[in-house]
């Protein structure tokens, strides 16, 4: 480790201990050498004893800076790793940092646009940032070519070295977790860190975010439910993104929404519809739908429309995952726990040798109490969370796409119930899920599949005779190969039998010759001939097997 890394590591450990986070380590794991080392190098007391453990962890991560703040935000979605009182505190982490100088942002923009002055492309460029976060910050301007208002998102110029340095240390700390925590190996800390690193590096590439926003906008073109601002790809690069500036009410500002006469029930239900449409119709969903990224249009408050921004994190499900997920939801709310267990095995989410009866009983034990509440009070996200936590006890592999989905569903539910506390998520979602499943297995699905495959089949049709001929030839060759292998095996079997017989005779001759040589020396050359015969017989047997 370099001196700089050692200083940073010392600061990280110092911060953790000053917030008393050594409480996370069971006392039995704090050995005498570890206690001596802690006293010698880190003698500071816990200065925040009045705060609960979850709050102390949140404050420590905030003190360590943006990389750790975003790491804590990601961990808040992994409720299989932490109890609720810690996960809830991590969810409160705010990705707010001091903005960097507007002149630096201007230099970044000019560099991304080929070194030309910013005035070449934009009018009314604001040096003061509109918003600032750990990865990037946003400035306003107008496009010179058409006068449209835009926002320019610029990556922080100094962020990559900071991320690389801190990620190195996070990996080192992750390697210590299995040694310090009794359940550390099951938590797979290095996999968690790898997942976080991928998410973080994806956010550093604004071309990826631009592509995500363009795709999402296309999916909801002319939709009354969701509006995605237009991206101007000609101005986008890895370090800069330009998109239409929008005006709306933050979805968390309930008072402002009510003041303009927004239909709150319809708005809440549309949030659910947007989520399930993204997941099941489009297989492409915005996976960072926290309140800071969602606005509501000022227009048509009686027919409200969401506005979505910041598409840096997206998720997708394949066709099989979508089907299993939809059937899981319906089976869950029908209390058909046997089907839930079987679906998990069929999908490959849990190992194929899982005892279905035990799995069904575990799901029933954990989830049956949930359904004692009225359906309107049941949290979809927490149902999914309980299901995944139970499945992990049966060695369910972590599915990154399902973790993203669960996090997004919790956001959608939280926002929906904040807008309209009586929101019945199940009543809103069930018709959509049932219709989707019916659409996947009915005649329309067969017609669609035929239409999708027909061009491929038509293209391949002239090749069918040749393919049939090749198949027959391969079948003949395979049969010849099988016959040869069977014949060789028979010959080998016969030779092995002969070898065993010869080895037996050779052993008898050697033993007889040896005994006669010891006990009947008067027999002269006979013992020697017997031993020589035994050796020769062994050699013949060995040749048979080689």
From Swiss-Prot:
Topology versus the membrane, per the UniProt entry?
Multi-pass membrane protein
Q: Which InterPro entries match?
A: ABC1_dom (IPR004147), Kinase-like_dom_sf (IPR011009), UbiB (IPR010232), UbiB_bact (IPR045308), UbiB_kinase (IPR050154)
Q: Where is the active site?
A: 288 (proton acceptor)
Does the entry feature the keyword Cell division, yes or no? no
Q: Does the record's keyword annotation contain Transmembrane helix?
A: yes
Give the originating organism: Klebsiella pneumoniae subsp. pneumoniae (strain ATCC 700721 / MGH 78578)
Fetch the HAMAP family from UniProt. UbiB
Mind telling me which GO cellular component terms the entry cites?
plasma membrane
Please report the stretch or stretches of sequence annotated as the Protein kinase domain.
124-502
Please give the function described in this protein's UniProt entry: Is probably a protein kinase regulator of UbiI activity which is involved in aerobic coenzyme Q (ubiquinone) biosynthesis.
**What are the record keywords, sorted?**
ATP-binding, Cell inner membrane, Cell membrane, Kinase, Membrane, Nucleotide-binding, Transferase, Transmembrane, Transmembrane helix, Ubiquinone biosynthesis
Location(s), subcellular: Cell inner membrane
User: Which family does this protein fall into?
Assistant: Belongs to the ABC1 family. UbiB subfamily.
- Give GO terms: molecular function aspect only: ATP binding; protein kinase activity
Enzyme type, top EC level: transferase
Where, by residue number, does ATP bind?
Answer: 130-138, 153
Task: Name the Gene Ontology biological process terms.
Answer: regulation of ubiquinone biosynthetic process; ubiquinone biosynthetic process
Q: Which Pfam families match?
A: ABC1
Q: State the source organism's domain of life.
A: Bacteria
Gene giving rise to this polypeptide:
ubiB
Pathway per its UniProt entry is: Cofactor biosynthesis; ubiquinone biosynthesis [regulation]
- Please report the name of this protein according to its UniProt entry: Probable protein kinase UbiB
Q: Which PANTHER family match?
A: CHAPERONE-ACTIVITY OF BC1 COMPLEX CABC1 -RELATED, PROTEIN ACTIVITY OF BC1 COMPLEX KINASE 7, CHLOROPLASTIC
Where exactly are the transmembrane stretches of this chain? 501-521, 522-542
* UniProt EC number: 2.7.-.-
């Amino acid at each position: 480790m370099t001196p700089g890394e050692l200083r940073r590591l010392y600061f990280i450990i110092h911060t953790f201990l000053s917030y008393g986070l050594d409480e996370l380590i069971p006392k039995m794991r704090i050995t005498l050498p570890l206690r001596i080392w802690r006293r010698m190098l880190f003698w500071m007391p816990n200065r925040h004893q009045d705060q609960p453990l979850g709050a102390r962890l949140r404050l420590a991560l905030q003190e360590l800076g943006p990389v750790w703040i975003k790491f804590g935000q990601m961990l808040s979605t992994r409720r299989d790793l932490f109890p609720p009182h810690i996960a809830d505190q991590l969810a409160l982490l705010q990705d707010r940092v001091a903005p960097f100088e507007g002149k630096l942002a201007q230099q970044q923009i000019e560099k991304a646009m080929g070194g030309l002055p910013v005035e070449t492309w934009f009018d009314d460029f604001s040096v003061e940032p509109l918003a600032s976060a750990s990865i990037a910050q946003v400035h306003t301007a107008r496009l010179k070519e058409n006068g449209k208002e835009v926002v320019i998102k610029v990556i922080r110029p100094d962020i990559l070295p900071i991320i690389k340095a801190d990620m190195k240390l996070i990996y080192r700390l992750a390697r210590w977790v299995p040694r310090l925590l009794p359940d550390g190996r099951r938590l797979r800390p290095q996999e968690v860190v790898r997942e976080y690193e991928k998410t973080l590096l994806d956010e550093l590439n604004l071309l990826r975010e631009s592509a995500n926003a363009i795709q999402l906008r296309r999916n909801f073109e002319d939709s009354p439910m969701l509006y995605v601002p237009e991206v101007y790809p000609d101005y986008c690069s890895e370090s800069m993104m330009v998109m239409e500036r929008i005006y709306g009410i933050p979805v968390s500002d309930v008072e402002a929404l009510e003041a303009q006469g927004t239909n709150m029930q319809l708005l809440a239900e549309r949030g659910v519809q947007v989520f399930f449409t993204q997941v099941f119709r489009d297989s492409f969903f915005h996976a960072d739908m926290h309140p800071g990224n969602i606005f509501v249009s000022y227009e048509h408050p009686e027919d409200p429309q969401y506005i979505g921004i910041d598409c840096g994190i997206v998720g997708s499900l394949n066709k099989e995952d979508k089907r299993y997920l939809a059937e899981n939801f319906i089976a869950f709310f029908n209390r058909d726990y046997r089907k839930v267990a079987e679906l998990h095995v069929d999908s490959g989410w849990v190992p194929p040798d899982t005892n279905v009866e035990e799995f069904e009983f575990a799901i029933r034990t954990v989830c049956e109490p949930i359904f004692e509440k009225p359906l309107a009070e049941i949290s979809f996200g927490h149902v999914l969370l309980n299901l995944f936590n139970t499945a992990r006890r049966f060695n369910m592999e972590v599915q990154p796409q399902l973790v993203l989905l669960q996090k997004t569903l919790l956001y959608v539910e939280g926002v929906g119930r904040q807008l309209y506390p009586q929101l019945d998520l199940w009543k809103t979602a069930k018709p959509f899920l049932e219709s989707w499943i019916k659409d996947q297995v009915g005649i329309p699905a067969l017609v669609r599949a035929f239409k999708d495959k027909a061009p491929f089949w038509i293209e391949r049709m002239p090749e069918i005779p040749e393919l049939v001929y090749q198949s027959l030839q391969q079948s003949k060759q395979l049969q010849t190969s099988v016959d040869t292998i069977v014949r060789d095996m028979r010959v080998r079997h016969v030779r092995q039998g002969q070898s065993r017989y010869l080895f037996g005779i050779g052993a008898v001759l050697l033993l007889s010759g040896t005994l006669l040589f010891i006990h009947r020396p008067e027999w002269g050359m006979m013992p020697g001939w017997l031993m020589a015969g035994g050796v020769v017989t062994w050699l013949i047997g060995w040749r048979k097997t080689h």
